[in-house]
């Protein structure tokens, strides 16, 4: 063995298994995965193009939606191309530093998505509870600051992880029992004391999910109070109708996060592929359904999409 290999504390590459125990079904599993990824790409790119092209959609709600679409594109594209390469071509190898980069992007953009969903809840709160101050509160400057804060929080919380993982000696082999480089899946291969990584990873996840979800719920408590005080049922229906798309996006994101986290800790003796499939569902489902939710439930988006197709006079 050469001297350069002896000094390495980490392998030059990892091997991603895919879905443990279901390797013989990879080609079939790839079909819904590929379909979901294609829908995510088409849907989110369409949202971005329409919001950019239509000046009437350059409002706070749609600017936050554009942020969400961009995040969903990066989030799904960070894992799905490599995942499909595993399923189709058995291309399981991933460079050590590419693995760390993938892990950083996946976890960072998940945190950014949570922040943007919280910002969208704040947008709905101001629109319904303080409608006369909406344009004064949600200025372009504030929206930019919110976007920068979402990025800064995610990068600050996730930057330590790649550096911590570089310090470990990986004596348990290079095989990761996963479809992508998830933090805890990589930590399991490391020797030595990994307790700080374990605690830090869980603490960050709990902090983000609990804090953001509580603030979202609090926003909707105030929104519900304001809606119930409206004079007519039609006004109440119209006001709350503007929140339906956001509630759908919230449920799509947090439900999958919570189910995946609970199953990972409660059903520890479940087959490995159950946890991996749930983790993939969390990665695929929100980016796929968010454009559909907003396209169907938001009149301005729906009209902009239909306006792309020329109508023939009868």
Swiss-Prot record:
GO cellular component: plasma membrane
Membrane-spanning ranges: 28-48, 57-77, 102-122, 142-162, 199-219, 240-260, 276-296
Spans within the Extracellular topological domain: 1-27, 78-101, 163-198, 261-275
Ranges facing Cytoplasmic side: 49-56, 123-141, 220-239, 297-314
Pfam families: 7tm_4
Bilayer disposition of the protein: Multi-pass membrane protein
Primary subcellular site in the record, as a coarse category: membrane
InterPro entries: GPCR_Rhodpsn (IPR000276), GPCR_Rhodpsn_7TM (IPR017452), Olfact_rcpt (IPR000725), OR51/52/56-like (IPR050402)
Superkingdom, natural source: Eukaryota
Any coiled-coil regions, as ranges: none
Annotated localization: Cell membrane
Disulphide bond pairs: 99-191
Annotated glycosylation sites: 5
GO molecular function: G protein-coupled receptor activity; olfactory receptor activity
Keyword set, alphabetical order: Cell membrane, Disulfide bond, G-protein coupled receptor, Glycoprotein, Membrane, Olfaction, Receptor, Sensory transduction, Transducer, Transmembrane, Transmembrane helix
PANTHER family in the record: OLFACTORY RECEPTOR 52K2, OLFACTORY RECEPTOR 56B1-RELATED
Protein family (similarity comment): Belongs to the G-protein coupled receptor 1 family.
Job of this protein: Odorant receptor.
Name of this protein: Olfactory receptor 52K2
């Amino acid at each position: 063995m050469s001297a350069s290999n002896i000094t390495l504390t980490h392998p030059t590459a990892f091997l991603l298994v895919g879905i443990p125990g279901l390797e013989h079904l990879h080609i079939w599993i790839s079909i819904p995965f590929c379909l979901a990824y294609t829908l995510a790409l088409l849907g989110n790119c369409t949202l971005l193009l329409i919001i950019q092209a239509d000046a009437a959609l350059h409002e706070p709600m749609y600017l936050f939606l554009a942020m969400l679409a961009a995040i969903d594109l990066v989030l799904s594209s960070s894992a799905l191309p490599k995942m499909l390469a595993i399923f189709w071509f058995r291309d399981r190898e991933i460079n050590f530093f590419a693995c760390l980069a993938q892990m950083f992007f996946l976890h960072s953009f998940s945190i950014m998505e949570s922040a943007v969903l919280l910002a969208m809840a704040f947008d709905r709160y101001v629109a319904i509870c303080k409608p006369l101050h909406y344009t004064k509160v949600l200025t372009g400057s504030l929206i930019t600051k919110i976007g920068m804060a979402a990025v800064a929080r995610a990068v600050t919380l996730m930057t330590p992880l790649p550096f911590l993982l570089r310090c470990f000696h990986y004596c348990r082999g290079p095989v990761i029992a996963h479809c992508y480089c998830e933090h805890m899946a990589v930590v399991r291969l490391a020797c030595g004391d990994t307790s700080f990584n374990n605690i830090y990873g869980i603490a960050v996840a709990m902090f983000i999910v609990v804090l953001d979800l509580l603030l979202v719920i609090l926003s909707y408590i105030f929104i519900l109070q304001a809606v119930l005080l409206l004079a007519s049922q039609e006004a109440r229906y119209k006001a709350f109708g503007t929140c339906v798309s956001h509630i759908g996006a919230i449920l799509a994101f947090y439900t999958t996060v919570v189910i995946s986290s609970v199953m990972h800790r409660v059903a520890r003796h479940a087959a490995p592929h159950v946890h991996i499939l749930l983790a993939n569902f969390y990665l695929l489902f929100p980016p796929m359904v968010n454009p559909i939710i907003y396209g169907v439930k938001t009149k301005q988006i729906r009209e902009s999409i239909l306006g792309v197709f020329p109508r023939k006079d009868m």
